[in-house]
């Protein structure tokens, strides 16, 4: 076991529970365990987590206590979008050393089942995915994690390193959806995943791109990220089919009813909302595809006959696999820039304020990140 410099701050984490409380309290491993290395298992490293993004799923676990069958049953630590510094390594770890900057891929698959052995470890039924109950998450000052799932990020900022997790979600969608250069693409939802998917689709050569949302502010933010994106504000008083007509108009400068009107070949659905999925289905061309990234309710109504008579493929994804090295290259080489996405930053001790900001649409927050050190907050904001 090798360690970095002596640390003084106690380990604390951000918890929720079945009563939907949210609080900060002491966490494992303890500072004493970090200093001694006694909590490290073979193959693990200790990471001082420097930056963690708040995901919509974190807010949902706090407010609702569950996502589908994943249920909070006791005191539970949130967070799975993290980057930090390696401060200790087990004796059998040779490719990482104290001082290395890493992004933490928050899953621990079994490495023995068919999905794992065929390279699709996101399908591992025994996977331990950090922040998904009952597995505690990364919103802690220190965490032990298998070294194989800690990816070196070089001089990349910890902010960008934490954003590699949602970027991985969008990269999985881009790859599995079959997006090609020049494809007209619809992105539904201008939240963090939708915005990162917009950046990814543009980098992959999609053109033109229309992005939708119910919030004018988020559409304006999308325009600031990708100036040539076309925006469409979803009208909540209209049917999914009528909103689709407006979307097709947006692709065609208001001439969506013309015989030769362009329709998207691919819709990347980033909300999981029933009406948005339906609008995407009504929008795409004959033989097109609706690829659902967003997580929605257990059951929803969709226009089945539209799918059938238009030969529209409806496809889904579950997390990601084998995306992190590519995500790192894309960010480090400037192909995708994530720098504008973090709009609010808070210290770990102020996690309640951070979550309240992330959960309140009135704040205009895009991505809220929680940082372990005051200098990280000040440095990132500068």
Swiss-Prot record:
Cofactor detail note: Binds 2 Zn(2+) ions per subunit.
GO biological process, one term: sorbitol catabolic process
Enzyme Commission no: 1.1.1.12
Residues that bind NAD(+): 192-193, 213, 218, 293, 317-319
GO MF, one annotated term: L-iditol 2-dehydrogenase (NAD+) activity
A Pfam family per the record: ADH_N
Record flagged with keyword Transferase: no
Residues noted as binding Zn(2+) 2 in the record, renumbered to the chain: 110, 113, 116, 124
Pathway(s): Carbohydrate degradation; L-arabinose degradation via L-arabinitol; D-xylulose 5-phosphate from L-arabinose (fungal route): step 2/5
InterPro entries named in the record: ADH-like_C (IPR013149), ADH-like_N (IPR013154), ADH_Zn_CS (IPR002328), GroES-like_sf (IPR011032), NAD(P)-bd_dom_sf (IPR036291), SDH-like (IPR045306)
Required cofactor(s): Zn(2+)
Keywords per UniProt: Arabinose catabolism, Carbohydrate metabolism, Metal-binding, NAD, Nucleotide-binding, Oxidoreductase, Zinc
Transmembrane segments: none
PROSITE patterns: ADH_ZINC
Catalytic activity: L-arabinitol + NAD(+) = L-xylulose + NADH + H(+)
Residues that hold Zn(2+) 1 according to the record: 55, 80-81, 165
Subunit (UniProt): Homotetramer.
Function summary: Catalyzes the NAD-dependent oxidation of L-arabinitol to L-xylulose in the fungal L-arabinose catabolic pathway. L-arabinose catabolism is important for using plant material as a carbon source. Also active on ribitol and xylitol. Not active with NADP as cosubstrate.
Family: Belongs to the zinc-containing alcohol dehydrogenase family.
Protein name in the entry: L-arabinitol 4-dehydrogenase
Gene (name only): ladA
């Amino acid at each position: 076991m090798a360690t970095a410099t002596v640390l003084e701050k106690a380990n604390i984490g951000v918890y929720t529970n079945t009563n939907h409380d949210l609080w900060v309290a002491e966490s494992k491993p303890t500072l004493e365990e970090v200093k001694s290395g006694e909590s490290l298992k073979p193959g693990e490293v200790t990471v001082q987590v420097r930056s963690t993004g708040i995901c919509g799923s974190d807010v949902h676990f706090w407010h609702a206590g569950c996502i589908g069958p994943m249920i909070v049953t006791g005191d539970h630590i949130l967070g799975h979008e993290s980057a930090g510094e390696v401060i200790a390594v087990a004796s059998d770890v040779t490719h990482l050393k104290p001082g290395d900057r890493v992004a933490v891929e928050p899953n621990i698959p079994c490495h023995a089942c068919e999905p794992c052995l065929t390279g699709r470890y996101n399908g591992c039924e025994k996977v331990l995915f950090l922040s998904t109950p009952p597995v505690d998450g990364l919103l802690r000052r220190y965490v032990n994690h298998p070294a194989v799932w800690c990816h070196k990020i070089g001089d990349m900022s910890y902010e960008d390193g934490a954003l590699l997790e949602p970027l991985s979600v969008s990269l999985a969608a881009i790859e599995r959806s079959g997006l090609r250069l020049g494809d007209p693409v619809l992105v539904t939802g201008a939240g963090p995943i939708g915005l990162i998917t917009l950046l990814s689709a543009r980098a992959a050569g999609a053109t033109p791109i229309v992005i939708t949302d119910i919030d004018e502010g988020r559409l304006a933010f999308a325009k600031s990220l990708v100036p040539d994106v076309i925006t469409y504000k979803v009208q909540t008083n209209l049917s999914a089919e009528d909103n689709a007509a407006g979307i097709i108009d947006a692709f065609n400068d208001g001439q969506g009813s013309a015989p030769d009107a362009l329709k998207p070949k691919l819709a990347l659905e980033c909300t999981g909302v029933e009406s948005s999925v339906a609008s995407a289905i009504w929008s795409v061309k004959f033989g097109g595809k609706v690829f659902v990234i967003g997580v929605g309710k257990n059951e929803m109504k969709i226009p089945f006959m539209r799918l059938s008579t238009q030969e529209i493929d409806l496809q889904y994804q579950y997390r990601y696999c084998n995306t992190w090295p590519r995500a790192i290259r894309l960010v480090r080489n400037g192909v995708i820039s994530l720098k504008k996405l973090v709009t609010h930053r808070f210290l770990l001790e102020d996690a309640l304020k951070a979550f309240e900001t992330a959960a309140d649409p009135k704040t205009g927050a895009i991505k809220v990140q929680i940082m372990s050190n005051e200098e990280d907050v000040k440095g990132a904001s500068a």
